[in-house]
Regions:
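Helix-start (N-cap) detector for alpha-helical repeat units in TPR-like alpha-solenoids
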Residues: 10, 44-45, 78-79, 111-112
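Canonical tetratricopeptide repeat
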Residues: 49, 83, 116-117
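Alpha-helical segment of the N-proximal tetratricopeptide repeat
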Residues: 7-39
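Structural signature of tandem alpha-helical TPR/SEL1-like repeats
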Residues: 23-31, 35, 57-69, 91-103, ...
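TPR-adjacent "capping" and linker segments in tetratricopeptide-repeat scaffold/adaptor proteins
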Residues: 1-12, 131
Length: 134
């Protein structure tokens, strides 16, 4: 999110939401982010921050929607793809999570992406069913 004189209040709300997420207060972050989401729903950084807050507050479907929106706006965002994979995994949608985590790791081979992909593969190999029972 970029700061413009007319949007300084929104920028401050965005920064406050970032700080609240860093302090493990995702619900407060979502409250601070509300006006920014209303005003700038097509800003990938705003959607990404909302997705992180939703994920950290176990609002998994809303997190999924936010990360999908980020990827609609910026398909090259490897972190959004990684976070989408984590949201899908937490919903028990392992095959979908695997596809997203695999793409994130291919886009940027960060250790945390590789580790998450490895852990998911172990879970899938152990036969833990996804939400469809497969």
């Amino acid at each position: 999110m970029t700061s413009h004189p007319a949007s300084d209040g929104l920028f401050e709300s965005f920064r406050r939401a970032e700080m609240l997420i860093a302090r493990s207060r995702p619900l407060d972050a979502l409250q601070a982010l509300g006006p920014v989401l209303e005003s700038q729903p097509n800003d990938a950084s705003v959607q990404l921050l909302a997705g992180r807050a939703y994920l950290n507050s176990a609002q998994l479907r809303l997190a999924e929607e936010a990360f999908v929106r980020v990827l609609d706006l910026d398909p090259s965002d490897h972190y959004a793809r990684f976070a989408l994979g984590k949201a899908l995994q937490r919903q028990g949608r392992l095959a979908e999570a695997h596809a997203q985590l695999k793409m994130a790791a291919a886009m940027d081979p960060r250790p945390e992406y590789q580790e998450a992909l490895g852990e998911l593969r172990v879970r899938m190999a152990a036969g833990q069913p996804d939400e469809t029972g497969n």
